[in-house]
Amino acid sequence: MSNWNLATILSSLHTDIQGRLGLARSSFAHPGVKGDASEAVWLSLLQTYLPKRYQAETAHVVDSEGKFSDQIDVVVFDRQYSPFIFDFQGQKVIPAESVYAVFEAKQTVDAALISYAQAKVASVRALSRTSLPIPHAGGVYKAKEPFPILGGILSFESEWAPALGPSMERALSDYADPGRLDLGCIAAHGHFNRKA
């Protein structure tokens, strides 16, 4: 019987993701194609490892008042209880009530791209989200408060040295709610999360 090692398994997964992001960066000259390939790596990771109740897609988010977000590279949403509003040729529109997290995916991170990601996150958090009372055999549960939507950025590299140092912290703190980035991953260097 062989000895399993969880640290080795997870390290191998990280190496695979980092390698695939590096391949996307080095193989394609066209920025749009390079970006699409990088998004596909992140989407594949989430689609493989999230519980099946959740789904990750590139999409627009819409609210009950008909307002739309910007296009979001990676939207994590509840597929079990929320149907798509619209899905045509890969262009998806997802109801705001079903969104758990949104991420901008980039080849690299710098102050301008952090600001860009913050604006994308803000475009989702600005949407109206509704909730209805839930009837049950013994009466009615009151409507639930909408849960906070996580916002983040996913990238291969960073323009800063150190990648996750003070320059990044300053860029992250330049934008308050609703564009706040809660977490992110720079595959070649590590991850960050907002301290509560």
Q: Each predicted region: which residue ranges?
A:
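Intrinsically disordered, low-complexity Ser/Thr/Pro/Gly-rich regulatory segments
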Residues: 1-71, 76-196
